[in-house]
């Protein structure tokens, strides 16, 4: 195994760790806001914690992302699929009928919002840490932090797509864009729809543009802090 492949494996491992942390904090966001809104279920199930492994799904957070990251590296083939990953869903009870709609919207938005907070965090570390983008001595750290910004911008954008089981679909349901029947019909085919979508070049191109647009302000902040 040559040095280039070993370097790719090393960055693949770092990418997987970054994904586990980012998905874990995304799910923590849901649990934390549910707890703030008076829902006892996430705390009772041990989900109001920053420990990412409390939010890890063995298949969705580790196995499938690892397969998609490392298969192209080990086989030398181009990556044919977008990276798919998910955490253990946070269960909520929405006990208060008077605030149920708003509670659900706020709890749902908390996940992507946490990813935006992570974008900010990586940018602050880069800027306040004095890690210049073109400094060869800081290349590895910069690459990791840049990956953190892009990954979390991607998670925020992807999760707001209004297709079940993504967060955007619950927001669409609560805003009346979907009826309950429409939501349930989409939910039956949601995973397949998403799998097809992320492998359509036009869709991937548009999503890439949106992700870059969302990531750009954080890189500007990073640069301003240097």
Name each model-derived stretch:
Residues 1-226:
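Hydrophobic transmembrane alpha-helices and their immediate loop junctions
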């Amino acid at each position: 195994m040559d040095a280039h492949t070993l370097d790719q494996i090393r960055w693949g491992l770092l990418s997987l760790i970054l994904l586990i942390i980012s998905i874990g904090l995304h799910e923590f966001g849901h649990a934390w806001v549910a707890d703030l809104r008076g829902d006892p279920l996430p705390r009772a199930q041990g989900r109001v914690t920053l420990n990412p492994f409390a939010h890890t799904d063995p298949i969705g957070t580790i196995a499938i992302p690892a397969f998609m990251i490392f298969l192209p590296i080990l086989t030398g083939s181009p990556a044919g699929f977008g990276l798919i990953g998910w955490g253990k869903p946070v269960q909520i009870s929405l006990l208060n009928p008077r605030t149920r709609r708003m509670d659900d919207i706020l709890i749902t938005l908390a996940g992507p919002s946490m990813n935006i907070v992570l974008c900010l965090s990586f940018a602050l570390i880069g800027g306040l840490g004095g890690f210049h983008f073109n400094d060869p001595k800081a290349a590895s750290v910069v690459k990791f932090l840049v990956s953190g910004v892009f990954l979390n911008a991607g998670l925020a954008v992807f999760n707001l797509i209004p297709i079940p089981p993504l967060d955007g679909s619950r927001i669409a349901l609560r805003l009346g864009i979907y009826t309950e029947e429409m939501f349930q019909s989409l939910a039956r085919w949601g995973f397949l729809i998403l799998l097809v979508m992320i492998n359509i070049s036009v869709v991937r191109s548009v999503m890439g543009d949106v992700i870059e647009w969302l990531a750009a302000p954080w890189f500007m902040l990073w640069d301003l802090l240097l």
